[in-house]
Protein backbone atom coordinates (compact mmCIF):
# COMPACT_ATOMS: atom_id res chain seq x y z
CA UNK A 1 0.00 0.00 0.00
CA UNK A 2 1.24 3.35 -0.88
CA UNK A 3 0.66 6.14 1.63
CA UNK A 4 -1.72 8.83 0.46
CA UNK A 5 -2.60 6.87 -2.70
CA UNK A 6 -5.49 4.72 -3.83
CA UNK A 7 -5.88 1.08 -2.99
CA UNK A 8 -4.18 -1.39 -5.23
CA UNK A 9 -5.61 -4.37 -6.99
CA UNK A 10 -4.75 -6.70 -4.07
CA UNK A 11 -6.97 -4.86 -1.59
CA UNK A 12 -10.27 -5.42 -3.52
CA UNK A 13 -10.55 -9.20 -2.85
CA UNK A 14 -9.73 -8.65 0.82
CA UNK A 15 -12.60 -6.18 1.23
CA UNK A 16 -15.04 -8.55 -0.45
CA UNK A 17 -13.99 -11.35 1.92
CA UNK A 18 -14.53 -9.14 4.97
CA UNK A 19 -17.94 -7.97 3.75
CA UNK A 20 -19.32 -11.55 3.50
CA UNK A 21 -21.37 -13.21 0.78
CA UNK A 22 -23.07 -10.98 -1.70
CA UNK A 23 -26.71 -10.13 -0.96
CA UNK A 24 -28.72 -10.87 -4.07
CA UNK A 25 -32.18 -9.92 -2.44
CA UNK A 26 -33.80 -13.37 -2.71
CA UNK A 27 -35.40 -14.74 0.47
CA UNK A 28 -35.95 -18.41 1.31
CA UNK A 29 -39.54 -19.50 0.44
CA UNK A 30 -41.68 -20.41 3.46
CA UNK A 31 -43.75 -23.54 2.84
CA UNK A 32 -45.29 -23.86 6.31
CA UNK A 33 -49.04 -24.67 6.49
CA UNK A 34 -51.59 -22.50 8.41
CA UNK A 35 -51.93 -23.12 12.13
CA UNK A 36 -55.59 -24.12 11.78
CA UNK A 37 -54.77 -27.19 9.69
CA UNK A 38 -53.87 -30.16 11.94
CA UNK A 39 -52.69 -32.28 8.98
CA UNK A 40 -49.21 -33.66 8.39
CA UNK A 41 -46.34 -31.39 7.35
CA UNK A 42 -45.94 -31.00 3.61
CA UNK A 43 -42.58 -30.99 1.85
CA UNK A 44 -41.00 -27.55 1.32
CA UNK A 45 -41.88 -25.81 -1.88
CA UNK A 46 -45.53 -26.97 -1.95
CA UNK A 47 -47.43 -23.75 -1.23
CA UNK A 48 -50.59 -24.59 -3.23
CA UNK A 49 -53.74 -26.34 -1.95
CA UNK A 50 -53.21 -29.75 -0.36
CA UNK A 51 -53.21 -32.86 -2.46
CA UNK A 52 -56.54 -34.63 -2.97
CA UNK A 53 -55.01 -37.98 -2.12
CA UNK A 54 -54.39 -37.00 1.51
CA UNK A 55 -57.27 -37.57 3.99
CA UNK A 56 -59.05 -34.38 4.85
CA UNK A 57 -58.93 -33.74 8.59
CA UNK A 58 -60.20 -30.17 8.69
CA UNK A 59 -62.91 -29.45 11.27
CA UNK A 60 -65.35 -27.77 8.91
CA UNK A 61 -65.75 -30.77 6.61
CA UNK A 62 -65.83 -33.47 9.30
CA UNK A 63 -69.64 -33.80 9.69
CA UNK A 64 -70.03 -34.22 5.94
CA UNK A 65 -67.78 -37.30 5.79
CA UNK A 66 -68.99 -38.98 9.00
CA UNK A 67 -71.51 -41.81 8.67
CA UNK A 68 -75.17 -40.92 8.97
CA UNK A 69 -75.68 -43.32 11.89
CA UNK A 70 -73.06 -41.48 14.01
CA UNK A 71 -74.19 -37.93 13.21
CA UNK A 72 -77.98 -38.24 13.67
CA UNK A 73 -79.30 -41.77 14.20
CA UNK A 74 -82.90 -42.12 13.14
CA UNK A 75 -85.16 -45.09 13.38
CA UNK A 76 -86.75 -46.22 10.15
CA UNK A 77 -90.45 -45.45 9.91
CA UNK A 78 -91.25 -48.96 8.73
CA UNK A 79 -90.42 -50.42 12.16
CA UNK A 80 -92.81 -48.16 14.09
CA UNK A 81 -95.88 -50.15 15.18
CA UNK A 82 -99.21 -48.65 14.21
CA UNK A 83 -102.16 -48.97 16.65
CA UNK A 84 -104.79 -51.25 15.17
CA UNK A 85 -107.82 -49.66 16.82
CA UNK A 86 -109.65 -48.14 13.86
CA UNK A 87 -108.76 -44.62 14.98
CA UNK A 88 -107.80 -41.98 12.49
CA UNK A 89 -104.72 -39.81 12.84
CA UNK A 90 -106.74 -36.59 13.10
CA UNK A 91 -108.66 -37.68 16.20
CA UNK A 92 -107.29 -35.92 19.32
CA UNK A 93 -106.52 -38.05 22.33
CA UNK A 94 -106.24 -41.27 20.35
CA UNK A 95 -103.50 -42.81 22.48
CA UNK A 96 -105.32 -42.52 25.87
CA UNK A 97 -108.56 -43.55 24.23
CA UNK A 98 -106.91 -46.63 22.74
CA UNK A 99 -105.41 -47.58 26.07
CA UNK A 100 -108.73 -47.18 27.85
CA UNK A 101 -110.53 -49.05 25.08
CA UNK A 102 -108.16 -52.00 25.38
CA UNK A 103 -108.30 -52.08 29.19
CA UNK A 104 -112.08 -51.87 29.42
CA UNK A 105 -113.82 -55.21 30.07
CA UNK A 106 -115.86 -56.75 27.34
CA UNK A 107 -119.04 -56.90 29.43
CA UNK A 108 -119.01 -53.18 30.14
CA UNK A 109 -118.73 -52.23 26.50
CA UNK A 110 -121.55 -54.45 25.29
CA UNK A 111 -124.20 -53.75 27.96
CA UNK A 112 -127.32 -52.38 26.29
CA UNK A 113 -125.56 -51.64 23.02
CA UNK A 114 -127.41 -52.59 19.86
CA UNK A 115 -124.61 -51.78 17.36
CA UNK A 116 -121.25 -53.59 17.57
CA UNK A 117 -118.39 -51.69 19.17
CA UNK A 118 -116.26 -50.57 16.21
CA UNK A 119 -113.96 -48.23 18.17
CA UNK A 120 -114.07 -44.47 18.33
CA UNK A 121 -115.30 -42.43 15.34
CA UNK A 122 -113.03 -40.04 13.46
CA UNK A 123 -114.41 -36.89 15.12
CA UNK A 124 -114.19 -38.17 18.71
CA UNK A 125 -112.42 -35.90 21.20
CA UNK A 126 -111.91 -38.17 24.20
CA UNK A 127 -112.06 -41.72 25.52
CA UNK A 128 -115.00 -43.86 24.61
CA UNK A 129 -117.67 -44.15 27.25
CA UNK A 130 -119.37 -47.48 27.75
CA UNK A 131 -122.64 -47.78 25.92
CA UNK A 132 -124.84 -48.61 28.88
CA UNK A 133 -127.96 -47.28 27.17
CA UNK A 134 -128.64 -44.49 29.63
CA UNK A 135 -131.38 -42.03 28.75
CA UNK A 136 -133.21 -39.18 30.44
CA UNK A 137 -134.73 -40.14 33.79
CA UNK A 138 -138.42 -40.78 33.30
CA UNK A 139 -139.57 -39.44 36.64
CA UNK A 140 -142.95 -38.41 35.29
CA UNK A 141 -142.47 -34.84 36.51
CA UNK A 142 -143.17 -31.99 34.08
CA UNK A 143 -140.33 -29.90 32.69
CA UNK A 144 -141.39 -26.76 34.56
CA UNK A 145 -141.65 -28.49 37.94
CA UNK A 146 -140.00 -26.23 40.52
CA UNK A 147 -141.49 -27.29 43.84
CA UNK A 148 -144.54 -28.69 45.62
CA UNK A 149 -147.82 -28.04 43.92
CA UNK A 150 -149.21 -25.45 46.32
CA UNK A 151 -151.42 -23.73 43.73
CA UNK A 152 -153.13 -27.07 43.07
CA UNK A 153 -154.02 -27.31 46.74
CA UNK A 154 -155.53 -23.86 46.59
CA UNK A 155 -157.51 -24.79 43.49
CA UNK A 156 -158.82 -27.93 45.17
CA UNK A 157 -159.87 -25.89 48.17
CA UNK A 158 -161.62 -23.42 45.90
CA UNK A 159 -163.45 -26.19 44.06
CA UNK A 160 -164.61 -27.77 47.29
CA UNK A 161 -165.80 -24.41 48.55
CA UNK A 162 -167.75 -23.93 45.35
CA UNK A 163 -169.34 -27.35 45.84
CA UNK A 164 -170.40 -26.31 49.30
CA UNK A 165 -171.90 -23.20 47.58
CA UNK A 166 -170.89 -20.64 50.18
CA UNK A 167 -172.38 -17.17 49.81
CA UNK A 168 -170.19 -14.12 49.28
CA UNK A 169 -166.42 -14.11 48.78
CA UNK A 170 -165.73 -17.03 51.11
CA UNK A 171 -164.49 -19.31 48.30
CA UNK A 172 -161.95 -16.72 47.14
CA UNK A 173 -160.85 -16.21 50.74
CA UNK A 174 -160.19 -19.91 51.27
CA UNK A 175 -158.18 -20.17 48.04
CA UNK A 176 -155.98 -17.12 48.69
CA UNK A 177 -155.63 -17.48 52.47
CA UNK A 178 -151.99 -16.96 53.58
CA UNK A 179 -152.56 -18.50 57.00
CA UNK A 180 -152.20 -22.04 58.25
CA UNK A 181 -153.59 -25.01 56.37
CA UNK A 182 -157.32 -25.36 56.82
CA UNK A 183 -158.70 -28.59 58.24
CA UNK A 184 -160.27 -30.79 55.63
CA UNK A 185 -163.21 -31.72 57.88
CA UNK A 186 -164.62 -28.22 57.63
CA UNK A 187 -164.50 -28.31 53.83
CA UNK A 188 -167.15 -30.99 53.54
CA UNK A 189 -170.81 -30.32 53.02
CA UNK A 190 -172.60 -29.16 56.18
CA UNK A 191 -174.90 -31.74 57.70
CA UNK A 192 -178.44 -31.20 58.89
CA UNK A 193 -177.20 -30.28 62.37
CA UNK A 194 -175.64 -27.08 61.03
CA UNK A 195 -177.71 -24.07 60.17
CA UNK A 196 -179.13 -24.19 56.64
CA UNK A 197 -177.75 -21.79 54.10
CA UNK A 198 -181.23 -20.61 53.18
CA UNK A 199 -181.75 -19.05 56.60
CA UNK A 200 -179.25 -16.27 55.90
CA UNK A 201 -179.51 -13.47 53.44
CA UNK A 202 -177.06 -13.60 50.50
CA UNK A 203 -175.90 -10.03 51.16
CA UNK A 204 -174.46 -10.85 54.59
CA UNK A 205 -171.39 -13.05 55.03
CA UNK A 206 -171.97 -16.46 56.54
CA UNK A 207 -171.67 -16.36 60.33
CA UNK A 208 -170.57 -19.98 60.67
CA UNK A 209 -167.51 -19.33 58.50
CA UNK A 210 -165.69 -17.46 61.26
CA UNK A 211 -166.74 -20.08 63.81
CA UNK A 212 -165.67 -23.05 61.70
CA UNK A 213 -162.33 -21.51 60.64
CA UNK A 214 -160.81 -19.78 63.65
CA UNK A 215 -157.49 -18.12 62.98
CA UNK A 216 -155.80 -14.90 61.95
CA UNK A 217 -156.83 -15.37 58.33
CA UNK A 218 -160.50 -14.56 59.08
CA UNK A 219 -160.02 -11.73 61.53
CA UNK A 220 -160.72 -9.08 58.91
CA UNK A 221 -164.32 -10.33 58.54
CA UNK A 222 -165.19 -9.23 62.06
CA UNK A 223 -165.25 -5.46 61.25
CA UNK A 224 -167.52 -6.22 58.31
CA UNK A 225 -169.90 -8.06 60.60
CA UNK A 226 -169.81 -5.16 63.03
CA UNK A 227 -170.86 -2.73 60.30
CA UNK A 228 -173.82 -4.89 59.33
CA UNK A 229 -175.13 -4.99 62.90
CA UNK A 230 -178.32 -2.90 63.40
CA UNK A 231 -178.30 -0.21 66.02
CA UNK A 232 -181.19 -1.75 67.97
CA UNK A 233 -179.64 -5.07 68.91
CA UNK A 234 -177.29 -7.91 67.98
CA UNK A 235 -177.28 -9.73 64.69
CA UNK A 236 -180.28 -12.01 64.20
CA UNK A 237 -180.98 -14.53 61.50
CA UNK A 238 -183.63 -13.48 59.04
CA UNK A 239 -185.63 -16.51 57.97
CA UNK A 240 -186.53 -16.65 54.31
CA UNK A 241 -188.39 -19.86 53.52
CA UNK A 242 -188.00 -21.28 50.06
CA UNK A 243 -190.90 -23.27 48.63
CA UNK A 244 -188.78 -25.76 46.69
CA UNK A 245 -186.10 -26.42 49.31
CA UNK A 246 -188.34 -28.45 51.63
CA UNK A 247 -186.53 -27.14 54.72
CA UNK A 248 -188.48 -25.82 57.68
CA UNK A 249 -187.54 -22.51 59.23
CA UNK A 250 -186.24 -22.55 62.81
CA UNK A 251 -188.74 -21.51 65.48
Curated annotation (Swiss-Prot):
Biased composition (Polar residues): 225-234
Residue span of region Disordered: 1-93, 107-152, 169-188, 224-251
Listed Pfam families: DUF4705
Source organism, top-level taxon: Eukaryota
Listed PANTHER family: DUF4705 DOMAIN-CONTAINING PROTEIN
The name this protein goes by in its record: Putative uncharacterized protein FLJ44672
Lineage: Eukaryota, Metazoa, Chordata, Craniata, Vertebrata
Amino acid sequence: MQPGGTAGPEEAPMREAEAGPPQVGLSRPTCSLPASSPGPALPPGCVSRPDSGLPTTSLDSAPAQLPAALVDPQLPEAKLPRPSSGLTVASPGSAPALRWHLQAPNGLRSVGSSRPSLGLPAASAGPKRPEVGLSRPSSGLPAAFAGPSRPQVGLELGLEEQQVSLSGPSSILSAASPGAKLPRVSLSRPSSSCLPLASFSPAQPSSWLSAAFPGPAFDFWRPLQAQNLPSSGPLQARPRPRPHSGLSTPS
